[in-house]
């Protein structure tokens, strides 16, 4: 089998005689790989490709085999969304928001194109001023400043060359992503609850309700929570988390800037909607949460866990048939939506359900750190003790945000999104992406 070690860009191939040259039709994913076996079009044989890693082939580029023969690259038609707008400003605005979602984007003079994603289509519809059309077309996203050059072994170019990945990925230190976190950036003061606040936050549960809450919070619940690190594994890889102190700072930061400001108050809104029988409001907040997940990894995580919990509720017959049907109609079901519904089904107090939801998240984060950093079991228990002490203040903040008019939901967490995006293509992982 012939091997192509180099290629000629389409702009420089104008003087070549390609009239008899075979072609090879490749998807974008295939054009981004550096090492693979290619089946030529029309059954004209096969070609091995081993070009410099980090390159993206484009329609019209020409692969050069070791014997000097040429093979023309043809881009395959793919399922894409094409975005058009009445004004350049509206198109630029759409590009900005898509860029915030780390979307591979093809930018033309009068339109944008990206791999079709129904969630992104919904986001654009909410922005307004643009039209998104689904079609089959060649997809050549702009590689910008990231095309070629040095890579870190996180991308699919290394999919079939483990030794090369190890050499590129583990033979050097990664440059820190940012400066170290200031000592007071991600800490909160543990609040000792007064007798009055304790009564409002921890309403009494009968034995059946307590058992139901423990069941829903159990690590043995088969919804896959232990499989995810929510960016923590990437933070470890980047050197942001490396010992007990930095782990505690990271989890505290996520607790007070991500969980307390968005996911926890949203859980409260979902719980109140389910308890009031307002399926439309519950579905609306479910969609809002799904659209707020900034990376594919985070969207797929909440989809998988929500779907698994919904299936469990269906098979065990939780709640009424009407409520189970309303949960089944969620498209897609997210974890906070289904968890809040389960608490409402069992008539659990809101404060108890919210506390269980947030503590389960904390417990999963600590368990992920014990495996990934790694840390000892006592270190994990010390962190849980510290985090648990500050939980009342976090829950109070979440309830206040949910009770405001309109609700004060804040999803601004750029580092969290960037670290999650890095984890999607991290070469070596313990946790799901």
Swiss-Prot record:
<comment type="function">
    <text>Involved in urease metallocenter assembly. Binds nickel. Probably functions as a nickel donor during metallocenter assembly.</text>
</comment>
<comment type="function">
    <text>Required for maturation of urease via the functional incorporation of the urease nickel metallocenter.</text>
</comment>
<dbReference type="InterPro" id="IPR036118">
    <property type="entry name" value="UreE_N_sf"/>
</dbReference>
<comment type="subunit">
    <text>UreD, UreF and UreG form a complex that acts as a GTP-hydrolysis-dependent molecular chaperone, activating the urease apoprotein by helping to assemble the nickel containing metallocenter of UreC. The UreE protein probably delivers the nickel.</text>
</comment>
<keyword id="KW-0511">Multifunctional enzyme</keyword>
<dbReference type="InterPro" id="IPR002639">
    <property type="entry name" value="UreF"/>
</dbReference>
<dbReference type="GO" id="GO:0065003">
    <property type="term" value="P:protein-containing complex assembly"/>
</dbReference>
<dbReference type="GO" id="GO:0005737">
    <property type="term" value="C:cytoplasm"/>
</dbReference>
<dbReference type="GO" id="GO:0019627">
    <property type="term" value="P:urea metabolic process"/>
</dbReference>
<feature type="region of interest" description="Urease accessory protein UreE">
    <location>
        <begin position="1"/>
        <end position="200"/>
    </location>
</feature>
<comment type="similarity">
    <text>In the C-terminal section; belongs to the UreF family.</text>
</comment>
<dbReference type="InterPro" id="IPR004029">
    <property type="entry name" value="UreE_N"/>
</dbReference>
<keyword id="KW-0996">Nickel insertion</keyword>
<dbReference type="GO" id="GO:0006457">
    <property type="term" value="P:protein folding"/>
</dbReference>
<comment type="similarity">
    <text>In the N-terminal section; belongs to the UreE family.</text>
</comment>
<dbReference type="GO" id="GO:0016151">
    <property type="term" value="F:nickel cation binding"/>
</dbReference>
<dbReference type="GO" id="GO:0003824">
    <property type="term" value="F:catalytic activity"/>
</dbReference>
<dbReference type="Pfam" id="PF02814">
    <property type="entry name" value="UreE_N"/>
</dbReference>
<keyword id="KW-0533">Nickel</keyword>
<feature type="region of interest" description="Urease accessory protein UreF">
    <location>
        <begin position="200"/>
        <end position="433"/>
    </location>
</feature>
<dbReference type="InterPro" id="IPR038277">
    <property type="entry name" value="UreF_sf"/>
</dbReference>
<keyword id="KW-0963">Cytoplasm</keyword>
<dbReference type="InterPro" id="IPR007864">
    <property type="entry name" value="UreE_C_dom"/>
</dbReference>
<dbReference type="GO" id="GO:0051082">
    <property type="term" value="F:unfolded protein binding"/>
</dbReference>
<protein>
    <recommendedName>
        <fullName>Bifunctional urease accessory protein UreEF</fullName>
    </recommendedName>
</protein>
<keyword id="KW-0143">Chaperone</keyword>
<dbReference type="InterPro" id="IPR012406">
    <property type="entry name" value="UreE"/>
</dbReference>
<dbReference type="Pfam" id="PF05194">
    <property type="entry name" value="UreE_C"/>
</dbReference>
<dbReference type="Pfam" id="PF01730">
    <property type="entry name" value="UreF"/>
</dbReference>
